[in-house]
Amino acid sequence: MFRSTLRSGALTFGYVLASALGSIASAQLLNHKDLSASIAITIAQTAIETCKANGYAVSATVVGRNGEVIVQIRGDGTGPHTMENSFKKAFTARTFGIPSGEMEDRLKQNPQMGAQYLTGFTTAQGALPIKVGEDVIGAVGVSGAPGGEKDEACVKAGIDKVADQLK
């Protein structure tokens, strides 16, 4: 009887183990699109050139899906703070999937929002998420123009330049 119970328990354990391994084996790999370096460079350069054409010296940062810097360019004649600001704007837009300037309104609605304590967080306008459909694959931030709305206009020009490749 003891052997029968032991054998039954071993068979049950084997069945459970085989089922679990079968589930793991049938798991799917994640499939997603990421920004290439060449697209990120085009976005950053176009944003900087657009602002320059309007008389503004800016820096630009493009971050990828995980908030990592893909390209960061300090524009000619920009202040040293523009590199950090452009990154914070891009990181915020990527993290929340919204224009960085919208964070100010969200923070006013919820002053206890934990996001304000994140390293790299800002409420400054001047960054937009980069999307393929509804999937946020990165973001670009610009800093240096006199006003976040001007930074954001340059960002939009950069994204628009590669819009046909974001599919």
Question: Can you say where each PLM-predicted feature lies in the sequence?
Answer:
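N-terminal secretory signal peptides that target proteins for export/translocation
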Residues: M1-R7
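Bacterial N-terminal signal peptides
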Residues: G9-I24
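Flexible, solvent-exposed loop/hinge segments and secondary-structure transition points
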Residues: A25-K167
